[in-house]
Amino acid sequence: MAATLRELRGRIRSAGSIKKITKAQELIATSRIAKAQARVEAARPYAAEITNMLTELAGASALDHPLLVERKQPKRAGVLVVSSDRGLCGAYNANVLRRAEELFSLLRDEGKDPVLYVVGRKALGYFSFRQRTVVESWTGFSERPTYENAREIADTLVNAFMAGADDEGDDAGADGILGVDELHIVFTEFRSMLSQTAVARRAAPMEVEYVGEVETGPRTLYSFEPDPETLFDALLPRYIATRVYAALLEAAASESASRRRAMKSATDNADDLIKALTLAANRERQAQITQEISEIVGGANALAGSK
């Protein structure tokens, strides 16, 4: 009985230690969500405007540019999977990896080989464990991405995309770049504090659309200089970098929101466990005291009877 009581008290101490960790993680995630959400909101207008500008440029010229034109018989599709560097964020990574696997299956059904690029240690570990080839990976900034991080990733993706037009083989070309005919980004879209959804978006060839309140306001008119082809060559890296940066910011906000929710649930569960264990320990202690009193009374009665 004494051993059982010691075991219960040990479990209470362990649960209390875990609760301190989860509560601290919850508070840290809570403090980061507001900043991450503000960065997402600040980046959206720029991403929308550069998309609008490219849409207008495409509509104003009959340009046969790789960013706009679907390639005949595409063979490979580059897929950037954005995950987290750390765990303790619930189903965040599982959802984005599941969405990536769904995209891989869809691409293979269309006769396209996925070429994998990864952001975050969790996705890198997942694909490495399954012996899947990762062309390039970036880690260490999933919670606080910068535009420089996005531009570094975009440079790699743009080089692969532009090399796709001349790359006819199944291996890397003479320049060491494995060309791709499409670019996709799989990330977690931040919709609200309680809603984050893993999505897959095609970044190139560009799906031409006008982003904005077309029905309620006038459409912006642009005057372009120099020629459209030069503009597209200059804007392509910036467009891809903007798409990547927006995805990184959405993913960072989603990661913090998922971690806060997971840690709050873990803290609440630790509270419930501590209460249950404390109740069990009190009952065990009460039973122990009752038994000791019974033994004392029994001993006293035995002594009285012997007299």
UniProtKB/Swiss-Prot annotation:
One Gene Ontology CC term in the entry: plasma membrane
SUPFAM superfamilies in the record: ATP synthase (F1-ATPase), gamma subunit
Annotated membrane topology: Peripheral membrane protein
Entry keyword annotation includes Thylakoid: no
Compartments reported by the entry: Cell membrane
Residue ranges of the TM segments: none
BP GO annotations: proton motive force-driven plasma membrane ATP synthesis
Chief subcellular location: membrane
Pfam families the record matches: ATP-synt
CDD domains listed in its UniProt record: F1-ATPase_gamma
Gene Ontology molecular functions: ATP binding; proton-transporting ATP synthase activity, rotational mechanism
Keywords, sorted A to Z: ATP synthesis, Cell membrane, CF(1), Hydrogen ion transport, Ion transport, Membrane, Transport
UniProt-listed PROSITE patterns: ATPASE_GAMMA
HAMAP family in the cross-refs: ATP_synth_gamma_bact
UniProt xrefs under NCBIfam families: ATPsyn_F1gamma, PRK05621.1-2
Biological role: Produces ATP from ADP in the presence of a proton gradient across the membrane. The gamma chain is believed to be important in regulating ATPase activity and the flow of protons through the CF(0) complex.
Family: Belongs to the ATPase gamma chain family.
Protein name as it appears in the record: ATP synthase gamma chain
Gene name of the encoded protein: atpG
